[in-house]
Amino acid sequence: MSQLSSRARVELAKASLSRIGLESPELRPYQDEPAQMPSGTVGKDGYLRLEFADRGDRSVMAFMDRRVPFLVQRALYWDEAMPQMPCIFIITTTGCVLQGDRMALEIEVGKNAQAHVTTQSATKVHMMNANYASQLQDIVVEEGGYLEYMPDPLIPHRTSRFLSKTRLSVAETGSLLYAEVVLPGRKYHHEDEM
């Protein structure tokens, strides 16, 4: 597992999140800060790092570091076909993504470790009148590792701006099952119901 301190990881994630928005020409008109809370403040600047390790008879969540709004449910072992695999639910206390949100997620599956990671529900990206929201995902699967990362769908609402960057690093003998689903928002609702 990586040797960076938790604080260094958070700072690196923050810097990366700032850059991905600035590097996107589509988002240049939306660099203004929302009136409520500027991006980078508590609850707007989420960070989650999960590390999984092989412990012989089963894999475990060996390390977790988080910043609001992320929470993680304790590991469950409910997959009968793979009883040694921990199943983890990522929970967000805000329940949605708002303008100015910056989220970073890092998942590292160590040598011969296994994990199933998902979310508690669909991620709703709400309407925005300023700025944008962004997400950076770094996923690493080491030799012999196996990861199922299947978050529930992302639902962007009208006038939302959401930038997501995902970096995948899978060793030659590692396996990753990854899904990303985007659904339209309330297409058939009346204008006043949005």
Label the predicted regions:
Residues 153-156, 161-163, 176, 180-194:
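Short acidic-hydrophobic catalytic motif
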Residues 133, 140-142, 184, 193-194:
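A structural signal for the main folded, soluble domain(s) of proteins
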Residues 117-119, 148-151, 178-179:
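General beta-strand structural signal in soluble alpha/beta enzymes
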Residues 1-132, 188-194:
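Terminal catalytic/cofactor-binding subdomain
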Residues 48, 103-105, 135-137, 145, ...:
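One face of beta-strands
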Residues 110, 142, 169-171, 179:
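Feature marks extracellular polysaccharide-active and adherence modules
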Residues 146-148, 168-169, 175-176:
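Extracellular beta-strand scaffolds
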